[in-house]
């Protein structure tokens, strides 16, 4: 009996020990799961604004009152502001609760104003105040006034608390208050600190979210008062130029030709267009000099040239772009050499880049008789072809052929983009995946010619609104796996198309998406570039945004001719 009891007792104890071991294992598993969850949260935080150096960055802080439903860096920017537009009316108060119109305040100051929204309880705002001396000095350098606007949420903030914080940091800049966050809400602010720069007329010129370094503060003011394209042009001329008017293809010098130090005809044409938008004849002439001296052969432009090797063919799209630039320069500055070179190139293009069917082809040999039997649809620039056909009847069949190829090149109602290319020999359109930059270039050409179908524009506008455009698509409209990444050039082209379509809201949103990889820090050697940290900067990713930014900053419209 005693032995039976001992057996049962030992069995019970063993069972209890087993349960203890199970409980221990469960506790360890739960702890590991919690650690993994924390790790994922911290990793996700790096993807929020502040996790990259290419956009104005703030360390994510729950005290900043962010809406966690927002998903992309652009969603933290002011939602109701637009570059080159007036902000919603803003009435603030001083310490004595006297109402002050911001527009009247700016008029009285007779200068631009750098508005920084903040609050005394915000840790990120405290970090911003650590560079307050630099901020005040930069504002003076750019001829602006720094204005601190306290986010006066009655539940969390008070005038007294704000005054103490200002005294603590020895701030000398003026401070106004936003009772009940009326202006904060009207402007669509998403977090503090956030900066908005207005010119002396009260027009929005730049904005940024989060805690900015001194270098980013300088970059913000540079954008506001020197133009959105100023730093980008400086980066191109300083880091991508060969010193003789050629724009190198990349900051990476290695690889098969064309390498980073080689110059593409694509880049030269885009730089000529930019010079026309900015009415900069000196830049135009410098760019043209290299193009003419080093790239022109038998009336056509080599698609690339380098120190060791040059392309043996042209790229018809680039020749058309350069012809348009030359015609635009002749009209703007009235100098005969521009028109003379344009005529020479037009003659060569007609003689060597048009097939027996009257169709424009992708390329022709510079020294031989060979030519392509295909045409990329993004090469069919109707604006240029129409202008040339009006002056030379021999080009009328080329225009008609281009219109027919484009008309037949639409993929489907459900996916209203255009096939990548057309083969004249097989009379068939390419079924290869679409490079989205090329696909949008086709849409840009059509929009400039007032020929973009409404459903194609709606397709693009929906994606601008959603903030997602893949870098490559199958012809069935699905995104190619592995190409769902952010492309600066794609967003720049989306902005240019929105501009042509007269959709200011879509233009602003596309600019914001485009700016995701913009290097704002004026103390960074890549300042003004669109590039990820540690990655090369490519010319196309700089030049397309350069055009969009120039237009956003008031540049002269140039649609080609």
Language-model regions: role of each:
Residues 168-171, 179-221:
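Thiol/disulfide oxidoreductase modules built on the thioredoxin-like
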Residues 26-27, 60-104:
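N-terminal "domain-start" segment that seeds a small globular fold
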Residues 229-238, 258-266, 312-317, 335-491, ...:
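Extended ligand-binding clefts on enzyme/binding-domain cores
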Residues 1-24:
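N-terminal Lys/Arg-rich, disordered targeting/topogenic segments
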Residues 126-168, 179-185:
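Structural microenvironment flanking redox-active thiols in thiol-disulfide oxidoreductases
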Residues 102-126:
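Short active-site neighborhood of thiol/selenol oxidoreductases, capturing the structured segment around
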Residues 439, 445-452, 500, 513, ...:
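Terminal, non-catalytic domain-edge segments
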Residues 232-319, 460, 490, 497-500, ...:
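N-terminal carbohydrate-binding/catalytic regions of secreted carbohydrate-active enzymes
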